Curated annotation (Swiss-Prot):
Residues 70-552 are extracellular. PANTHER family: PROTEIN FAM234A (PTHR21419:SF7), PTHR21419. This is Protein FAM234A. Its main location: membrane.
Length: 552
């Protein structure tokens, strides 16, 4: 019988428990007064109340965030916009900066107008002491193309450097510094267009400014980087240092003892010393910023000097020993293994020099180089340089590995005189999309005049090396061209400044923005080799899904 009860208990455990409850009920009732809830019941009620209170609090927070607190307005980005200026001329300058702080890059440019203004500005040439026409700097919204501000800054052609940080406590975080003719140095608040400071320069009437304006370390301790201005007068290059915070001269003009040309750069050696490098024919001229400042100011400088470079520099000619084949056209600081190296571009070769001892790492021979090369990434996180070799029908576009000089990609692509420089934009896969101008016609094409329909913009991505995508066809003169990431990761755009360039007669000047993704979806696919595996639409779809990233 006992075994039978145990078996029944195993089969029906709940029934066994129910039978035991009445037996124990009396004992429990005797120990606890009637009407008093059990401790477990009170705890259960507390837990239930806490659950509903927390649920109510969560719902309240969701309600407040969703319906009461307004979401920040995100400006609607137009795929295409255009702004026109009649009877104007344009200058080769485009810059991108978030002017109105809407987290979208805006566009700054220069133009010279025969009228006092386009009608969007409350300032005329006469308001700033200039005769009509004069040079304006303008900022337009990258989202819509609406004019944010414009202001006259110079009588004639100007050199501009934007993104100059201002001293702490200044009303403006950054400024565009404009050097115009006649010589005047003006800083314009990039947020409002208001003049922060204006200083006359000490340039002679026959002096010519060698662009660009070079940023040097803060020598006057005002919290803003200073500017080195190089001018050429009577076959001599003179240098003056101006405060980036006030425009006042930090050091008066002094001869660098060289007769260089434009295209100078500021190079920092492995020892942290700053040297100005200037193309001087087939040679490379240089002066240390420390030596230039201390010579004219007769004060000590916090800057460093590099004994190795001082030994390499000729005391008489200020020339560095560089064996260049042909006249030097361009100098570029490029990323190296232990600091910046130097890419030297002459009329006959590209040469990568070690950034410290200037020994050649590699040389790539060319026939004729007219444009500055463009840096990018052909392989993931591996720097490459896009170069243009030759001109006209003999032009060739190449991508070289920056570390070795090896050819990664090449394509014959005839060009036209006055084609804009190439551009690149990093993509999310740690490569770059490359943009360049040219004319690609099939071998069976009946077109007798290359480029008769206009200049054509092509796009190349390294994941599709056998395909070019023709994005645009422009028939008007192009003064400046840039590919800009207006919004991180999502909105890349081509910016074109077209019209007559100074000193041509005035005409219609236009600034146009095209969204890259829209151009890709409507682009013409050019197969460089037979037997492409993907259809034209598949190529367009694949390239339209590219995500872009900002420069590191």
């Amino acid at each position: 019988m006992t075994d039978g009860k145990d078996l029944e208990a195993e089969i029906h455990p709940l029934k066994s428990e129910n039978r035991k409850v009445p037996e124990n009920a009396g004992a429990l009732a005797g120990k606890e007064p009637r009407g008093t809830p059990a401790p477990q019941t009170r705890l259960s009620h507390c837990r239930t109340a806490a659950f509903f209170l927390s649920l109510f609090a969560c719902l309240l927070v969701v309600f407040v965030v969703s319906f009461i607190i307004p979401c920040p307005d995100r400006p609607a980005l137009q795929g295409v916009w255009r702004i026109d200026y009649n009877a104007a001329v344009a200058y080769d300058f485009l810059a991108a900066e978030d002017v109105n702080k809407d987290k979208i890059q805006d566009i700054l440019f220069l133009y010279k107008n025969t009228n006092s203004s386009r009608g969007n500005s409350s300032f005329s040439c006469a308001d700033e002491g200039f005769s009509c026409p004069c040079t304006f700097v303008a900022a337009v919204s990258g989202a819509s193309g609406s004019v944010l501000w414009e202001r006259p800054v110079a009588q004639d052609r100007a050199f501009v450097e934007c993104g100059i940080l201002q001293p702490r406590g200044s009303a403006a975080p950054s400024a565009c510094v404009v050097l115009g003719r006649p010589g005047s140095l003006v800083a314009v608040d990039t947020l409002t267009g208001k003049t922060l400071w204006s200083q006359p320069s000490s340039f002679g009437g026959n002096a010519s400014v060698l662009s660009p304006l070079l940023r040097v370390p803060d020598l006057d301790a005002d919290g803003a980087p200073d500017l080195l201005v190089l001018i050429q007068e009577e076959n001599q290059v003179n240098g003056s240092i101006y405060s980036g915070g006030t425009g006042q001269q930090v050091s008066p003009p002094d001869s660098l003892g060289v007769d260089g040309t434009s295209g100078s750069i500021l190079h920092v050696t492995r020892a942290g010393a700053h040297y100005v490098l200037i193309p001087c024919g087939t040679a490379l001229c240089s002066r240390s910023v420390k030596g230039l400042y201390e010579k004219v100011s007769r004060r000590d400088s916090p800057l460093k000097s590099d004994p190795l470079w001082e030994d390499m520099l000729s005391a008489a000619s200020h020339r560095l020993v560089v064996h260049s084949s042909g006249a030097i056209r361009y100098l570029m600081n490029v990323p190296g293994k232990a600091g910046d190296d130097l890419l030297l571009v002459s009329t006959e070769a590209y040469m990568l020099l070690d950034g410290q001892d200037l020994t050649p790492r590699w040389t790539f021979g060319t026939t004729q180089v007219l444009r500055k090369p463009v840096l990018g990434y052909y392989k993931p996180d591996t720097p490459a340089v896009l170069v243009e070799n030759g001109t006209g029908p003999d032009r060739q576009v190449l991508l070289l590995d920056l570390g070795s000089g090896a050819v990664l990609w090449s394509q014959a692509l005839p060009g036209l005189p006055g084609d804009p420089p190439s551009a690149s934009l990093p993509t999310a896969d740690h490569r770059s999309a490359f943009f360049f101008w040219g004319i690609h016609e099939p071998t069976d094409s009946n077109q007798t005049e290359p480029g008769a329909a206009g200049r054509r913009l092509y796009m190349l991505h390294p994941t599709l090396p056998g395909v070019l995508l023709e994005l645009d066809n422009v028939s008007v003169p192009i003064v400046a061209f840039q590919v800009v990431l207006l919004e991180p990761g999502r909105h890349a755009a081509c910016i074109l400044l077209t019209g007559p360039a100074s000193p041509s007669p005035p005409g219609l000047v236009s600034v146009t923005k095209h969204k890259v993704q829209d151009l890709v979806l409507a682009g013409r696919v050019v197969h460089l080799a037979e037997g492409g595996a993907e259809s034209d639409q598949a190529v367009r779809d694949r390239l339209s899904r590219l995500r872009y990233r900002s420069e590191a």
